[in-house]
A protein has these predicted regions:
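Compositionally biased terminal segments of proteins
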Residues: 1-162
Length: 162
């Protein structure tokens, strides 16, 4: 994915989240690329503090340009898991993770910061997970994946240098 496609897929979701007062942060490889060495990625990861009462409004705002399923979102909120959005013009997948109730996740939300995805004075700012939280999340995903995925561990040294 290239930065213009990432922003084309991400901006309407962020616009909808902000219009509905949904707190979010960008993480995963998109987030680690901001703090470290940019690399290709297959999706965009967001963590969001979603409430069931806002699901229908979110769907209405995004249904024209995204594959979005209200029942799947409601299940993700209830289970504190994730759901996918597909940006139809670019076919980019956005994984949205419901914020968990663990202390770490709550603290991570308090440490997020506004950053641009590119080195541009004019670029839009997004809420991003802190470099430290991206490292910890990547290590956690590495552990949950049986410690075999190089994708999670490769980003760590580059983010850590920031």
């Amino acid at each position: 994915m290239n930065p213009p496609d990432i922003q084309a897929a991400l901006n309407p979701v962020i616009d909808a989240f902000e219009a509905l007062g949904i707190v979010y942060c960008v993480g995963g490889s998109v987030g680690s690329s901001v703090y470290g060495i940019p690399r290709t990625t297959v999706d965009i990861d967001l963590v969001a503090d979603l409430q069931k009462a806002k699901v229908n409004s979110l769907c209405k705002l995004l249904q024209e340009t995204y594959y979005i399923d209200a029942s799947v979102i409601e299940q993700a909120i209830q289970r504190r898991s994730s759901f996918n959005l597909i940006h139809l013009p670019t076919m980019i997948k956005i994984d949205v993770f419901a914020v968990k109730s663990r202390s770490f996740d709550q603290e991570s939300f308090r440490r997020m910061r506004r950053e641009r995805l590119e080195d541009s004075v004019k670029g839009r700012e997004y809420y991003l997970a802190s470099p430290e939280d991206i490292i910890l999340n990547k290590l956690e995903w590495y552990r949950h994946g049986g410690e075999v995925s190089e994708r999670q561990i490769i980003d760590h040294p580059w983010v850590q240098r920031m």
